C-alpha cells in the first residue's frame, strides 16, 4: 500500500518525466494575490503566468501545493473532524501548461497516471464535461474508450471555471471514482450526487476563453491548463479507505494525539483526535510560513484554529498543553517534503505551547459559563444569542467555537440574537466614538471598519508587500478612484506601513498599482484601520485594485534606531536615577528622539555622560533584539516595563534588549531592557550605530525631557561639533587639544581687564563729574555728585569711595545714562540709626520722575526717566535731611 509520501512522489515524478518543471510549493500567504487570505489551490502561484503578466523559463509545471481553507468563502472549519473529507489543511497535486499543451495532452496525461502509475481499474472511473465541450468528450472516448454514459455532460458552472468576473476562463472536466453499489449515492448531476459512491478525484480546467466586462467572451491567444487533485482524497482511494482520516499520514497524527492524551484513538474521543490531527497541520504550516496568532487578519484565523483544537484536547481530558508535543510526529511525516517545517519546528512548538497555556484558563472559565447557561435552559433549546456574545466578548470565544461545543450536545446557537448583541455593541461604540471630539467625518471610518474589519499589519516582518485597495476617502467621502494631484486616505486589507502610535511616527513610502502610483506621506490608525495619507503622483488609483506597497527603507531604519535607543535610554536612566523613573511620553522620528520621564530635578553633566556611555556600551555589544507575544500578566511577571496609564488587551508584544547579570528581568533574569511595545525595532543593537544626548530640560512639573540623536544623525552632529571646534581653534591660533587652557586664560584675562576698566570709569567719573562741596545739613555732612555714563552696576563702588571722602555723613550720586538717570545713595554706618539711604534715593528719584527704589540703610539705588533735573533731585534729598 503506497503511503501519501509515495503518492506525492509518484505524481511529481510522472510529470517530471513528461517535461514538467517540478516547482516547490508556494507559501500559505500568497505573494502576488492580496485578495486571498491563504493559498487555497495550486494555481495561485501561477496566476500571473496565466494572465500573461509574468513569464518564466518553463511552460510546463507540476506542484504539490500546501493549501489552507479556513476563512472567507473557502471555509471548511465547521465541518472538520465530523466528515470524511473536510480539512483546514490539504495538499493539492497539480500540473499546469502556460500556452504549451492543451486538452489533447492533458486528458491522456491524467488517464495514464491514474490507470497505469496508480493502477486504478479503468472501469471504476467516469468523467464529467461541460455540456457544450464536445472536444473534451471526444478525447475521452478516444483516449480512455469511455462510453457516452460514463461521460456526463454538466450544464452548470460546476464544470465551467472562471478566475474572476473578468479574465481567463473555460470549461473543465472532472474525474470520478465509483466505489460501487454498496455505497449510497448517484452519479454527478443526479439527485443523489451528494452521496459517497461517486467521489471526485481530479479536476482539469481548460483555460481557452477570456471573459470581458460587457459579458462577452473571446478565445485566448494562448490556451492553458490548470489541474488539481487532493492528495488526501486520492491517498484514501489508493489505500482502500473511504475516509481521509484513515490514511497513513492522518492516522499517525491521530495516534500521536491519542498517546499524548492517554486515550483510545477510535473510542468516544475519535472526533476530537481527528480535529486535533487536522488542525495540527494547518497551525504548524501557517506558523512555519510566518503567520503568528493575533486578533486580526490571518493571525486571527490561526488563533481560531488553534483554540478549536485546544478545546478538543481539553475534552479529551488533557490537563497540560498538548499540541506542541505532537509537532515531532508531524515533522517525521512531512518534514522531508516540506523542509520549512523542520526549520521552524522550535518556533512552532513554542508558539503552540504559549498559546495553549494562555488559552487554557480562558477556556475553562468560558466552558463553565456555557454549562451554567445551558443549565438554565430547557432540554434541547438553543443557547441565547446574548450568552454566546458574552462568551465572545468576555472570554474570546469565537461564535464557531461555541457552535462546535454545542454541536456535540445536539444544540444550536441563536445566531440572530448573537448578531443583534453584536450590532448593539457596535452602535454603542459608534455613539461613543462620534461623541469623542473627532472630526465631523469620523463616522466614515467607523463604517469602513465595520465593512472591512481591521487592517492586518505586516511591517514587523517586511517593508514591502502586496495589498488590496479596499477604500479611498477624499474630502471626508468615499470615492471610487483618485487621479494625479489628488490627496486621499487609502484603506488596505494588509500593509507593511506602520501607523503612528506609541510615540513612533507613521511610515512613508509608495503605493503602486497597474494604473497609477501614489506617495504615502503619513499613516495613522483609527478603529483598527490604518489610514494611509497619500498623494497620487501618477495615473489613477482605483478601489478594489491590487497594490504593491513599499516602505521608505532609509527612513524606517532611522526610526527603528531611535525607537530602540529610547528603550536603552529608559533603562539607563532608571539605573542612574532610580526606579521612580517612568516614561511619560516620547517621540521616535527619523531625525531625532525625545524621551519624557518622571524626575524632579535637572541631570548633572556627569549623570548625562554616564547615561550616554551606558547606552553606547550596549549598542557596541551588538546584542540581539527579540520580541515575544504574551499576556500582560506574564509580561509584568518577567519584569517588563509598561507605559504609564496605557490600557492593554489580552496579549502584548514584549521587546527585550541586552544582557545584564542579576537584572531580575526576562526568563533568565539577565535581560537589560524589557518593555511592552508595539513599535518597530532594530534586529541587533549595533544597528543603532551611536547615541548622542543633546541635553536635558524641563517638560512640565516633575517631568524632564531628554533629546538625542542616533545613527547617521548622531554622526553628522558630532562632525559638525568637530568642525566648530576646529574653527574656534583656528581663530584662537591654538591646537584643538590646547583649547580648554587657552579659553581659561582668555576668561581670566577678560576678568582682569573688566576690573581695570571699572576702576578707570570710577576714577574718570569722580574726577570729571559735576561735584558739589560737602555741606552740613542738620549736623550731618552731605556730598552730592552728577556723572555721565556710569552704569548702575558700577555705582555701589563709587558710593563707597564718596563715603570714604566724607568720613561721616550721607552721599548721593546721579548718573546720566543717555537721558535716563541711575541714582545711588549712601549713609556711613555711624548714622544709619538716624538716616536711611533708601529714604534719600526715593526722594531724589521722585524729583526725576522715578518711583520706588530700594536697598539697605547704608546703600540704596533707584532709576528715573529724566536725568536733566539732577539739581532738583539733589534739593529733594537735602530737604529730607532737613535742609
From Swiss-Prot:
What is the E.C. number? Answer: 6.1.1.7
The answer, when asked if Protein biosynthesis is one of the entry's keywords, is yes
- This chain belongs to the protein called Alanine--tRNA ligase
Database matches in InterPro entries = aa-tRNA-synth_II/BPL/LPL, Ala-tRNA-lgiase_IIc, Ala-tRNA-ligase_IIc_anticod-bd, Ala-tRNA-synth_IIc_core, Ala-tRNA-synth_IIc_N, Ala-tRNA_ligase, Ala_tRNA_ligase_euk/bac, DHHA1_dom
The UniProt note on the cofactor reads as follows: Binds 1 zinc ion per subunit.
Alphabetized PROSITE patterns for the sequence: AA_TRNA_LIGASE_II_ALA
Which Gene3D superfamilies does this one have? 2.40.30.130, 3.10.310.40, 3.30.54.20, 6.10.250.550, Bira Bifunctional Protein, Domain 2, Threonyl-trna Synthetase, Chain A, domain 2
Alphabetical list of Pfam families matching this protein: DHHA1, tRNA-synt_2c, tRNA_SAD
